[in-house]
C-alpha cells in the first residue's frame, strides 16, 4: 500500500504541470456543475413560487376574433364578452365551476387627492379576483359582494399610488375620498404586488365601473375557479364544452379556438412541471459532460 502511494507521489512530482491542469479541469467541471444546478434550481423554484401565489384551479377567458364562418356570419368577426357570458359561466356549469368573475377596464383616468394626482387605469372586478391574480392586500379590505350588489363607489389603491397621493400630507389613505373624473370614491384598501412596479391599476366593484363609464353589458375578460378537473384530458374536455356554451351565446363555431382564448393555469402548471423535469435532466447531462 505504501509503495502505491509512493509511486503516485513520484508520478505527480515528475508531471507537475499535467497534474495541475488535470486538477484544475476537474475542479472547474465541479464548479460549473454546481453553478448549473444552482441556476437551474433557482429558475425552477421561481416558477413554482409564482404558480403557488395563484389558484391552480383557475381559468381566464379573453375575447378574440372568429377565424371560421358560422351560422351565416363571416369569419373575422370580433367577439365581445358580456354579462350573459358571465351569468352562463356561473350558473350553467355547476359540476365544474366553483365561482365566476369578470373584469372591465377604463384607461387613462386622473385620480386626485387635493393637489396631488396620478394617471392610471381603473379595473372593475369581482371579489374572487384575488384568487386568480397576485393582489397582496396589506391594509383595509378588497372589493366585496355588498360593493357589487349596491354598486358602491369604493376603491382599492396600489401602495405606490397611495404614496403619491397621501404621503406629502401624512394622511392615512383608508377612509379618504379621491376624485376620478368628477366621481368621488372612498378608499377602502391598499394592495401591493410582487413587482412593486409604479402606479398599478386601482380596483373598483365591477358593477360600479360598468355603470359609471357606460360599458353597457360588455366586459373585458372572464375568470373562474374550477373543481373536479384533475387531469389534462378532463380540462381539455371542459374547455371544449365551455367553448360550445359561450359559442351558443356569441354565435361562433365551438371548434374555432381563436374566437375566445382560454388560459388554464392547471394545464399550464402540468406542462411547466414537465418542462422542469426536462430542465433538470439537461442540467445534469451538461454538468456531467463538463467533468
Could you tell me what each predicted segment is?
Residues 128-143, 153-253:
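Mid-to-C-terminal secondary-structure elements
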Residues 41-121, 128-131, 211, 237, ...:
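Hydrophobic, regular-secondary-structure patches
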Residues 1-31:
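N-terminal Sec/SRP start-transfer signal
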Residues 253-289:
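Peri-transmembrane interface segments
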Residues 15, 43, 61, 89, ...:
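Generic structural signal for small/hydrophobic residues in well-ordered secondary structure
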Residues 21-32, 280-291:
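Alpha-helical transmembrane segments of integral membrane proteins
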Residues 69-79, 112-116, 190-195, 224-236, ...:
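Structural beta->alpha junctions
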Amino acid at each position: 500500500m505504501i509503495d502505491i502511494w509512493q509511486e503516485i507521489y513520484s508520478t505527480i512530482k515528475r508531471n507537475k504541470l499535467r497534474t495541475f491542469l488535470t486538477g484544475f479541469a476537474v475542479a472547474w467541471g465541479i464548479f460549473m456543475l454546481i453553478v448549473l444546478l444552482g441556476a437551474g434550481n433557482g429558475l425552477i423554484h421561481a416558477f413554482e413560487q409564482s404558480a403557488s401565489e395563484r389558484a391552480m384551479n383557475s381559468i381566464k377567458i379573453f375575447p378574440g376574433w372568429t377565424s371560421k364562418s358560422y351560422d351565416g356570419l363571416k369569419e373575422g368577426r370580433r367577439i365581445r364578452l358580456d354579462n350573459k357570458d358571465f351569468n352562463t359561466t356561473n350558473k350553467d356549469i355547476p359540476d365544474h365551476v366553483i365561482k365566476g368573475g369578470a373584469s372591465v377596464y377604463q384607461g387613462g383616468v386622473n385620480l386626485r387627492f387635493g393637489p396631488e394626482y396620478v394617471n392610471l387605469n381603473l379595473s372593475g372586478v369581482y371579489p374572487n379576483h384575488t384568487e386568480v391574480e397576485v393582489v397582496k392586500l396589506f391594509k383595509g379590505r378588497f372589493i366585496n359582494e355588498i360593493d357589487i350588489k349596491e354598486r358602491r363607489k369604493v376603491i382599492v389603491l396600489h401602495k405606490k399610488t397611495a404614496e403619491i397621493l397621501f404621503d406629502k400630507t401624512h394622511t392615512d389613505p383608508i377612509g379618504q375620498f379621491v376624485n376620478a373624473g368628477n366621481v368621488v370614491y372612498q378608499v377602502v384598501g391598499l394592495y401591493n404586488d410582487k413587482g412593486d412596479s409604479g402606479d398599478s391599476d386601482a380596483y373598483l366593484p365591477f358593477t360600479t365601473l360598468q355603470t359609471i363609464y357606460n360599458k353597457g353589458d360588455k366586459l373585458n375578460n372572464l375568470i373562474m375557479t374550477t373543481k373536479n378537473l384533475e387531469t389534462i384530458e378532463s380540462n381539455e374536455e371542459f374547455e371544449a364544452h365551455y367553448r360550445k356554451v359561450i359559442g351558443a351565446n356569441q354565435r361562433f363555431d365551438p371548434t374555432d379556438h381563436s374566437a375566445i382564448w382560454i388560459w388554464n393555469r392547471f394545464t399550464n402548471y402540468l406542462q411547466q412541471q414537465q418542462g422542469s423535469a426536462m430542465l433538470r435532466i439537461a442540467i445534469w447531462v451538461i454538468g456531467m459532460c463538463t467533468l
